[in-house]
Amino acid sequence: MGRNIKIIKKNLAFLNDFSPGILACLIISVLAYGLEILEKQLFGQAWLESLVLAILLGSITGSCFTLPKYFQKGITFCAKTLLEIAIVLLGASISVNAVLSAGWNLLASIIFVIFVTLILSFTIGRLFGLSSHLAMLVACGNAICGNSAIVAVAPVIKAKHEEVASSIAFTALLGVLIILFLPFLHPFLNLSFSQYGVLSGMVVYAVPQVLAATASVSFVSVQIATVVKLVRVLMLGPLIFALSILYHRSAQTRLRLHTLVPWFIIGFIFMMLIRSSNLIPEKTLIPIRFIAQLFTVISMAALGLGVDIRSLKKAGWRVILASTCSILILGVCSLIMIQLNDLNPIMF
């Protein structure tokens, strides 16, 4: 009896702490779905998908209003946990054969683009007057996986807290801008759905954000972009190892590389293996995709709520210019590699 009471109290505490933020994200998500339906009725099609609308509505709300602190836990839960679950569920729609069919050509291209972006971004950062540590943080953030890479690299290169805060300040806003504008560029880039997936996987900051950048284009783009982005994230380990040697860090730092693989990547791979073993019935794939998309829309609302345009002041114009140039370099290099190597993988 006493154990049951403790469980009830724990659940009530969870609801009390998380429900305000979750409810805010749900309201924004419902509005986003409603606006998408309204678009279809007025124009015959949705020019802005619910994913994008959720980000926009969330960003407007987050920038115009300062939400009370008790909203934060629920918003963080939606932005992080729900989105990670969506990524895991997405693994059920991709088979191992599909990944292997991408070939070594794609893998080599990803590594090459990351390498070139790191060097050029670091150089440009230094030319803009950034410290070597800050320039490296900006370069790693854009080349690998945004804030996650910045946080992982910072202790290895002994970056100052101010440098970490400055490099992170503009990342959230720039990441949202990429998600919003990349789908609009697709018709003008003359890329197939597969090639657009490669481009998105190369330039979008985080694995979860890949869904928002590609869902409005095609599900093929979603699949390929996710795989490409996962490969980029997995490059964080070798990068940390190289930087630890370059900056003469101790062996203890290098031994922590196993912590650099997030649980949802392991979950994604696990689901992909289950799908490849034919253990997931085909009729369940549609509901799984629906749940993944629903969680993603809610998470995009939370992501938008975390964006504050006023953070531009914290970043400083040098960091803003360096980050913008870095992402442009990444995009141009990716497009060049797509065309030169005829990167057009097929997922099934």
From Swiss-Prot:
Q: Name one GO cellular component term.
A: plasma membrane
Note the topology in the membrane. Multi-pass membrane protein
Q: Where does the UniProt annotation locate this protein? A: Cell membrane
Q: Which cysteines are joined by disulfide bonds?
A: none
Listed A to Z, the keywords are:
Cell membrane, Membrane, Transmembrane, Transmembrane helix
Membrane-crossing residues? 13-35, 45-67, 74-96, 106-128, 135-157, 167-189, 196-218, 223-245, 257-275, 285-307, 319-341
InterPro entries per the UniProt record, alphabetical: UPF0324_pro (IPR018383)
Q: What is an example of a Pfam family matching this protein?
A: Cons_hypoth698
Q: Say which family it is in.
A: Belongs to the UPF0324 family.
Supply the PANTHER family for this chain: INNER MEMBRANE PROTEIN YEIH-RELATED, UPF0324 INNER MEMBRANE PROTEIN YEIH
This protein's name: UPF0324 membrane protein BH02290
